[in-house]
Swiss-Prot record:
It is an enzyme of class 4 (lyase). The gene is dsdA. Transmembrane segments: none annotated. The modification N6-(pyridoxal phosphate)lysine is found at residue 118. It holds the Pfam family PALP. Its EC number is 4.3.1.18. This is D-serine dehydratase.
Length: 442
């Protein structure tokens, strides 16, 4: 972006100056509305989410057999919700800032099949596509036992079709493993940030991995192009997919059930704050949408991004959405949080969700490494750097009197609050790689 344009952007949006300086930044969204006001802009409804629930239930018998690690939950891919009191104390000590309320962790990092939040959206979209093809071919009805999809005739049928996706790693992992299991030919276009072990794991499942020297945006574009030339190839579009988004949104109702099981209350007197790491936006956007449908105006969602890849904060704050990238303002999009290394946010998610999100913040790679180490020490839970992005959120909220006033929170409401950090990945990181992460914390 040329200087004059940049200066006028900063004049209009002074916060951009802090982003450019790679400062850890927090922006509480003045444009938040109630669910009732914000919902029409999403373009999706509660019924769409119910349909996704139903589809995943139809596939549960198949998943339970195809992936024995899901058998215990009857083929439902869901993660644990745990309290992390020792980590809460450690954060308070390290940052000299109390966290009022209780700190919880949602362990999507340990979801079965692919060990990340992408096991929600990625797997769902592959299943939805497989179902559509099988229904259209007359090989399946909605009332069938879907475990029949494991038979050789279905494998044969699906092998005529292929799937392509662009990814920094975790989405590719979930889509690759699922597609290969069903019988699709699958190609994952991986950006320069993708970890070597993720590529190796995909190849071990018979997935074709195409590697790029450039970032996520290029990998997605190339994947899109390659798929266009083949009528039997379906491209999963992480930047714009409503199907992926709905796969993530199912998490809302499920979390509500987990809260009920644990006797946790969410209402006006007991607010819920949720902190979601954000790359291109589909995962956190879908989850936040589901949470809003489940808990209404009593849940407050925040997106967390690396200082080097603040694409969603930049897009929503300036109102330019996918018309601006972090590279346009001179930020390099290079971060240890490979899952969040995205320079241009999803325009669909930004426009759909900007009224339903309470805020956005950035944190440095070093902060992620520090918290990664503390969590391993205090709670024995090991995550990848991206998954710690949410962990900085509770203190930003508790430290901001202006945010608390904007929403009229009393001291008592904050004492009764639940702070939920969404851990997005790390359950399948190889030991030696994890040791390198741990060595970088202070």
């Amino acid at each position: 972006m040329e200087n004059a344009k940049m200066n006028s952007l900063i004049a209009q949006y002074p916060l951009v100056k802090d982003l450019v300086a790679l400062k850890e930044t927090t922006w509480f969204n003045p444009g938040t509305t109630s669910l009732a006001e914000g919902l029409p802009y999403v373009g999706l409804t509660e019924q769409d989410v119910q349909d996704a629930h139903a589809r995943l239930s139809r596939f549960a018998p198949y998943l339970a057999k195809a992936f024995p690690e899901t058998a215990a939950t009857g083929g439902i891919i869901e993660s644990e919700l745990v309290a992390i009191p020792a980590m809460q104390k450690r954060l308070e000590k390290e940052y000299q800032q109390p966290i009022s309320g209780q700190l919880l962790l949602k362990k999507d990092s340990h979801l079965p099949i692919s060990g990340s939040i992408k096991a929600r959206g990625g797997i769902y979209e592959v299943l939805a596509h497989a179902e559509k093809l099988a229904l259209e071919a007359g090989l399946l009805t909605l009332d069938d036992d879907y475990s029949k999809l494991l038979s050789p005739e279905f494998k044969q049928f699906f092998s005529q079709y292929s799937i392509a996706v662009g990814s920094t790693g975790n989405l590719g992992l979930s889509i690759g493993i699922m597609s290969a299991r069903i019988g699709f030919k699958v190609t994952v276009h991986m950006s320069a940030d993708a970890r070597a072990w993720k590529k190796a794991k995909l190849r071990s499942h018979g997935v074709t991995v195409v590697e790029y020297e450039q970032d996520y945006g290029v990998a997605v574009e190339e994947g899109r192009k390659a798929a266009q030339s083949d009528p039997n190839c379906f491209f999963i579009d992480d930047e714009n997919s409503r199907t992926l988004f709905l796969g993530y949104s199912v998490a809302g109702q499920r979390l509500k059930a987990q809260f009920a099981q644990q006797g946790r209350i969410v209402d006006a007197d007991n607010p819920l704050f949720v902190y979601l790491p954000c790359g291109v936006g589909g995962g956190p956007g879908g989850v936040a949408f589901g949470l809003k449908l489940a808990f209404g105006d009593h849940v407050h969602c925040f997106f967390a991004e690396p200082t080097h890849s603040p694409c969603m904060l930049l897009g929503v704050h300036t109102g330019l959405h996918d018309q601006i990238s972090v590279q346009d303002i001179g930020i390099d999009n290079l971060t240890a949080a490979d899952g969040l290394a995205v320079g241009r946010a999803s325009g669909f998610v930004g426009r759909a969700m900007e009224r339903l999100l309470d805020g956005f913040y950035t944190l440095s790679d070093q902060t992620m490494y520090d918290m990664l180490g503390w969590l391993a020490q205090e709670e024995g839970i090991r995550l990848e750097p991206s998954a710690l992005a949410g962990m900085a959120g509770p203190q930003r909220v508790c430290a901001s009197v202006s945010y608390q006033q904007m929403h009229g929170f009393s001291a008592e409401q904050l004492r009764n609050a639940t702070h939920l950090v969404w851990a997005t990945g790390g359950g399948m990181v190889p030991e030696e790689e994890m040791n390198q992460y741990l060595a970088k914390g202070r």
